[in-house]
C-alpha cells in the first residue's frame, strides 16, 4: 500500500496509543485458507482477464466521494497494473464473504480526513524520531484504519456514505445540570461517598465467609484484587459507528435484555459506554471518558469542514460525557429530556447506593402509571441510573482496594430487582423473556463466592430462626439466580408466607421493614421457576398458593395503607442520608393477583387515609393514582399467569375472551375464580347482586373446560355442618364486596381455627378480618364452584343522623307540644259549655 500509507498509520496510532497495544494482531484467516484458491481470481478464464475490483463512479454521489482520485486515472485497463497508490489517499478494499466471486469495492479515503484536518491541508512531514514509550492511557481513541482491530466493522457501516448517527448534534449539546460535579465539588454537590475500609481492617477471603460475617456484613471487607475483574485491554466499538474505536482498560459489563429492549454498559478505568435500545424508540448511547479526552465524530469525508467532537454537555472536573442518538429538537421533548438527564448521571455521585435509591423512586414517579405500554423516557432514566450505579460501584471498589460484604450483596440484589422492574414496568417486556447479567467479578472468584453463598443459605435454613436472617437467605438465593438455590429455599419461603398469613388473620402487625423484605424475596423465589421453563407440579403448587395468600393479604385497607406508606417514604427519601429501598416497603399487593388497585374506589380509600400536608389535592391524587397503577402493573405478569394459572388464559375455539381480569383466585390446583366487570363465555358464572349498575361485578369459576353456564348464589345466614370436627370449610375463600363494586377482601380459610370463626359468625365487639363496618356483602367461595351468600357477615347501611338534626327535632317536638297545650287551654276557656255536665 505504499510507504506513505504506512507513515500515516504510524503517525495516527503513535499519537493515540504510543507503543502499547490493547489487542493481539492476527492474520486474516480467510487469507490463510485461500492460499490455494489463486485460480478463482480469474474473472473470465476464456479471455484471460484478471480479477479486478469495482470502483465507485465519481459522478454518482454520495459513494462517488470515495472514488479513486482523478490523477491515478484508474480504468479497467490500468487496474491490473496495481498502480493504486496516491500520496494523499489511503486505499481500502471492501468485500463480502463471497469474495472473490464478489470482486469488492476499491475505496479511497483522504489522509487529511484521517488526521482530522481540512481537505486542502498539507500533510505533516515524515519524522525519523521514534515515539517515546509512555504508560498506556486509560482511554485512547484509535483513529485511522491501519492496525485497527475494528476497521472492517467501521468500513461496513454507513457512517461515511449515507448515514449519520447524530442528525442533530445541537439537540444533544446542552449545558451541565444543577447536580453535576463542579470544581468545588468534584464528585457532585449531593454526593455521599461510599464507606472506605478502616486502616488495618482485615480483608476476608470469600472461601472463609460464615454466618457471623453475614451478621456483620457492613463491617466485613473483601479484597478487590482477585474478587473483581482485573482491568484488561479492550477495544470498545461504538455500535452506531459514529466515532472511532476506543482503547480502554475494561473492568466488566452489565447487560439487560428482553423481547422488547436491550441495554449494555461496558465499564472501564475512567470509562463507560452505555447503549440503550428499544423496539419503540431509536437507540441512544452515552460514553464517559476522562475530562481531558475528546471523541471525534466519524463523518462524510467529502465534507468541507472536518467532523467535530461528539455532542454532549461540557466536560467536568473528572469526566466528560458524550451523548449520541437520532433524536432531534422536533422529536418528543420528554424523550430528549430523559436522554439529557441520563447524560448527567455519571457526574452526580460516586456511591452506587444513591443511584439505586433514585432508580427505585423513579419507578414510582408521577408518570410511572400514567399510561399502558412501553415508555422509553422512563426506561432510559431507569436503565441510566442502573448502569451508572454499576459504574460507581466498580470505580469505588477499585479505588478503595476493598468492598464491604453488605455493599457487594446489596448491589447484586438491588440491580437484579431493578432490572426486572425496568424491563416489565417501563419497556413492556414479556416477563419470561427478561435476562440480566452483571459480569464485574473475576470468573474464578465468582464460582468460589457462589459456592460459599450456597453453603451459607443451607446453613441459615437449617440452624437459624431469625426472620431477618431468613430474609437474607432468600436474598442470597435471589442473587445466585440458580435453580438449585431457588429449590433449596422454596420450602422455607412457602412456610414463611403461610406464617405471615396466620399472623395477619390473628390481627397482629406484619408491616415492619424486615417483614416486607422477607416477603419480597420469598415471593421472588417462589415465582422464579417460570422464567427457567415449564415449572414442575410442586413448583406450580407452591407458586399458586403464594399468589393466593398474597391476594388474601392485599385487602382494601392494606392497599390504601401501602399507598400511604410509599408516598411517605418517597417524600422522606433524599437519596443521600435517607435512601429508598423498595424491598423494605414491599406490599403483598405487588405479588398478588389483584389487578383492580387503580380503580377509583381504591384511589378514594387511599386518599381518605392520607395525612394532612401542604401538597395540593390534585397533586396528591395524581401521586396516589400513579402509585396504585404501578402496583397493579408490577403484579400483572401475563407470562406468570400462563405458567401458574393456565386455566385463566385457556383458549376455546382458538380465541380467548377479551375480558380483563380484576382479581384471580387460584382455589385448587386446576381451578380458579375470576372477578370481572363483564360476563365470561365459559365456566360457571355468577352475577353479584347489590352492585352499582355502572360498575357490575361478575364472578366466574374457571377450569380448563370450555363449557359455560350460569347459577344463582344461594343465601344462608351461616354455614351449617353435620360434623363439628371437620366443618369442610378449609380451602374455601371468604370474599367481601361493596355496592360500589369494590372487592374489599378475598381471604383464604386455611386452618381449623379459621373455619371455626366462619361457622360461629361475627362476634360483636371482637375485631376480626372477616368483619367490616363498611356496608358490604359477604360470600363464601368453595373449591367445587359453589358460592354461598353469608347473610350473618353482611354489613347493612345505618342511617346516620347528625347531632344538630336531633337537637332541632327535639326542640320542634317541645314547641309543638307547648303549642298544643296552649290551644287546648284556649278551647277550655272559650267554650265552657263543652265541659258542663248534663
Swiss-Prot record:
N-glycosylated, O-glycosylated, and sialylated. The heterodimer glycoprotein H-glycoprotein L is required for the fusion of viral and plasma membranes leading to virus entry into the host cell. Following initial binding to host receptor, membrane fusion is mediated by the fusion machinery composed of gB and the heterodimer gH/gL. May also be involved in the fusion between the virion envelope and the outer nuclear membrane during virion morphogenesis. Residues 174-204 are annotated as: Disordered. Belongs to the herpesviridae glycoprotein H family. Residues 1-18 form the signal peptide. Glycans are attached at residues 73, 120, 216, 332, 437, 670, 784. The chain crosses the membrane at residues 804-824. GO terms for biological process: fusion of virus membrane with host plasma membrane; symbiont entry into host cell. The keyword Ligase does not apply. This is Envelope glycoprotein H. Residues 19-803 are virion surface. GO terms for cellular component: host cell endosome membrane; host cell plasma membrane; membrane; viral envelope; virion membrane.
Amino acid at each position: 500500500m505504499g510507504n506513505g500509507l504506512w507513515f500515516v498509520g504510524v503517525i495516527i496510532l503513535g499519537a493515540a496509543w504510543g507503543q502499547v497495544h490493547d489487542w493481539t494482531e492476527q492474520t486474516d484467516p480467510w487469507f490463510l485458507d485461500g492460499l490455494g484458491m489463486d485460480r478463482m481470481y480469474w474473472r473470465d478464464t476464456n479471455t484471460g482477464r484478471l480479477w479486478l475490483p469495482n470502483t465507485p463512479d465519481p459522478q454518482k454521489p454520495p459513494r462517488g466521494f470515495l472514488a479513486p482520485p482523478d490523477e491515478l486515472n484508474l480504468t479497467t485497463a490500468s487496474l491490473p497494473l496495481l498502480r493504486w497508490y496516491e500520496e494523499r489517499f489511503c486505499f481500502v478494499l471492501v468485500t463480502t464473504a463471497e469474495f472473490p466471486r464478489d470482486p469488492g469495492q476499491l475505496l479511497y479515503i483522504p489522509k487529511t480526513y484521517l488526521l482530522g484536518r481540512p481537505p486542502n491541508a498539507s500533510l505533516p512531514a515524515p519524522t525519523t524520531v521514534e515515539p517515546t514509550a509512555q504508560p498506556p492511557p486509560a482511554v485512547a481513541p484509535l483513529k485511522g484504519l491501519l492496525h485497527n482491530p475494528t476497521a472492517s466493522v467501521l468500513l461496513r457501516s454507513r457512517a461515511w456514505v449515507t448515514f449519520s448517527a447524530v442528525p442533530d448534534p445541537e439537540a444533544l449539546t446542552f449545558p451541565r445540570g444543577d447536580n453535576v460535579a463542579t470544581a468545588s465539588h468534584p464528585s457532585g454537590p449531593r454526593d455521599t461517598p461510599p464507606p472506605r475500609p478502616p486502616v488495618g481492617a482485615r480483608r476476608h477471603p470469600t472461601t472463609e465467609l460464615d454466618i457471623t460475617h453475614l451478621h456483620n456484613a457492613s463491617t466485613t471487607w473483601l479484597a478487590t484484587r482477585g474478587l473483581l475483574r482485573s482491568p484488561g485491554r479492550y477495544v470498545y466499538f461504538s455500535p452506531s459507528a459514529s466515532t472511532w474505536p476506543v482503547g480502554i482498560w475494561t473492568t466488566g459489563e452489565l447487560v439487560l435484555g428482553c423481547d422488547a429492549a436491550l441495554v449494555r454498559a461496558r465499564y472501564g478505568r475512567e470509562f463507560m459506554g452505555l447503549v440503550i435500545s428499544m423496539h419503540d424508540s431509536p437507540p441512544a448511547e452515552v460514553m464517559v471518558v476522562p475530562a481531558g479526552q475528546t471523541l471525534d465524530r466519524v463523518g462524510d469525508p467529502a465534507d468541507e469542514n472536518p467532523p467535530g467532537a461528539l455532542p454532549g454537555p461540557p466536560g467536568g472536573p473528572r469526566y466528560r460525557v458524550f451523548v449520541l442518538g437520532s433524536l432531534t429538537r422536533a422529536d418528543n421533548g420528554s424523550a430528549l429530556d430523559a436522554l439529557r438527564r441520563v447524560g448527567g448521571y455519571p457526574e452526580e455521585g460516586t456511591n452506587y447506593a444513591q443511584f439505586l435509591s433514585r432508580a427505585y423512586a423513579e419507578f414510582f414517579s408521577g408518570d410511572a402509571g400514567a399510561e399502558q405500554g412501553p415508555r422509553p423516557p422512563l426506561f432510559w432514566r431507569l436503565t441510566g441510573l442502573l448502569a451508572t450505579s454499576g459504574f460507581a460501584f466498580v470505580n469505588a471498589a477499585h479505588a478503595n482496594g476493598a468492598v464491604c460484604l453488605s455493599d457487594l450483596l446489596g448491589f447484586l440484589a438491588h440491580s437484579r430487582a431493578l432490572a426486572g422492574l425496568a424491563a416489565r414496568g417501563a419497556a413492556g417486556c414479556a416477563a419470561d423473556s427478561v435476562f440480566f447479567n452483571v459480569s464485574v467479578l473475576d470468573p474464578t472468584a465468582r464460582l468460589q463466592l457462589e459456592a460459599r453463598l450456597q453453603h451459607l443459605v443451607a446453613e441459615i435454613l437449617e440452624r437459624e430462626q431469625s426472620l431477618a436472617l431468613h430474609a437474607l437467605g432468600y436474598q442470597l438465593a435471589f442473587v445466585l439466580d440458580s435453580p438449585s438455590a431457588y429449590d433449596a429455599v422454596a420450602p422455607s419461603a412457602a412456610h414463611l408466607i403461610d406464617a405471615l398469613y396466620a399472623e395477619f388473620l390473628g390481627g397482629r402487625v406484619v408491616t415492619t421493614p424486615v417483614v416486607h423484605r422477607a416477603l419480597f424475596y420469598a415471593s421472588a423465589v417462589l415465582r422464579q421457576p417460570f422464567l427457567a421453563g415449564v415449572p414442575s407440579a410442586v413448583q406450580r403448587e407452591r407458586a399458586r398458593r403464594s399468589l393466593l395468600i398474597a391476594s388474601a393479604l392485599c385487602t382494601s385497607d392494606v392497599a390504601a395503607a401501602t399507598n400511604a406508606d410509599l408516598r411517605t417514604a418517597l417524600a422522606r427519601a433524599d437519596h443521600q442520608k435517607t435512601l429508598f429501598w423498595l424491598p423494605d416497603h414491599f406490599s403483598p399487593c405487588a405479588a398478588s393477583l389483584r389487578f383492580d388497585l387503580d380503580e377509583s374506589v381504591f384511589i378514594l380509600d387511599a386518599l381518605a387515609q392520607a395525612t394532612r400536608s401542604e401538597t395540593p389535592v390534585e397533586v396528591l391524587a395524581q401521586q396516589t393514582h400513579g402509585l396504585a397503577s404501578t402496583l397493579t402493573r408490577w403484579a400483572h405478569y401475563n407470562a406468570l399467569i400462563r405458567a401458574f394459572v393456565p386455566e385463566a388464559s385457556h383458549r376455546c375455539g382458538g380465541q380467548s375472551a377479551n375480558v380483563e381480569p380484576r382479581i384471580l383466585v387460584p382455589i385448587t390446583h386446576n381451578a380458579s375464580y375470576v372477578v370481572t366487570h363483564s360476563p365470561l363465555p365459559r365456566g360457571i358464572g355468577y352475577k353479584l347482586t347489590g352492585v352499582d349498575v355502572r360498575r357490575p361485578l361478575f364472578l366466574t369459576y374457571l377450569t380448563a373446560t370450555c363449557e359455560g353456564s350460569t347459577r344463582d348464589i344461594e343465601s344462608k345466614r351461616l354455614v351449617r355442618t353435620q360434623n363439628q370436627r371437620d366443618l369442610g370449610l378449609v380451602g374455601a375463600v371468604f370474599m367481601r364486596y361493596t355496592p360500589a363494586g369494590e372487592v374489599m377482601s378475598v381471604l383464604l380459610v386455611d386452618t381449623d381455627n379459621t373455619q371455626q370463626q366462619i361457622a360461629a359468625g361475627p362476634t360483636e365487639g371482637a375485631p376480626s378480618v372477616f368483619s367490616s363496618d363498611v356496608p358490604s356483602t359477604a360470600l363464601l367461595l368453595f373449591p367445587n364452584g359453589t358460592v354461598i351468600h353469608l347473610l350473618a357477615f353482611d354489613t347493612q347501611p345505618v342511617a346516620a343522623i347528625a347531632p344538630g338534626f336531633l337537637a332541632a327535632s327535639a326542640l320542634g317536638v317541645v314547641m309543638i307540644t307547648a303549642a298544643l297545650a296552649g290551644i287546648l287551654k284556649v278551647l277550655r276557656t272559650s267554650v265552657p259549655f263543652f265541659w258542663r255536665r248534663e
